[in-house]
Amino acid sequence: FRAFIEMLRANFAHAGGLRIDHVMGLQRLWVIPLGATPADGAYLYYPVEDLLRLLALESLRHRAIVLGEDLGTVPEGLRDKLSERAILGMRILLFEQDYGARFRPVLEWPDTALATTSTHDLPTLNGWWHERDIDWNAQLGLVDADTEDHWRDNRAHERNGLHHALSLDPQNFQEEATGADQVLNASARFLGHTHAPLVLLPVEDALGVLEQANLPGTVGTH
């Protein structure tokens, strides 16, 4: 494990915290043989318990926090393993909803994960509210007309769902306030009222930027 330990120490030497992108990679990685299709791939498994113990040890030695980006296809039990070692996960406001566009109430957010409005791979909160991500996908031909219409109908329900979740705290958000600026401000305060031990507000959402930094699945067109 020397290379892994040296990598951790090199990073901790210059920062008080470390964010591990796709932390699921400590447990398994989907690999595809050269020239093959994704259907020919398989999971390559790693000694996750040993890696997490080393990660916890080095973070303690350097008095640093560790964040694990646990979004996407998360192996069963991994989040429990992370929380047992005080490694924070990540919860994204736009993702914290069920299929009925019911957003997670403020007091139901976990205390084992960082809370944030969005990420560089997702629309900004302002862009999400104005459907800019849908605009881009339609403009680039990544979705057909039927999918676009369904997406926009669903987004309208999501906006109503977020609006309702924010309005449950009358001191935070007034029911009649529907402008994007009010939603941005209320969303930031909402996350601050959760149990999350750390809240991250991306600069794009702090400034109300409309366009997202990266549109996954595109190269040179966004």
Report each predicted region and the residues it spans.
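Catalytic cores of glycan-processing enzymes that make or break glycosidic bonds
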Residues: 1-222
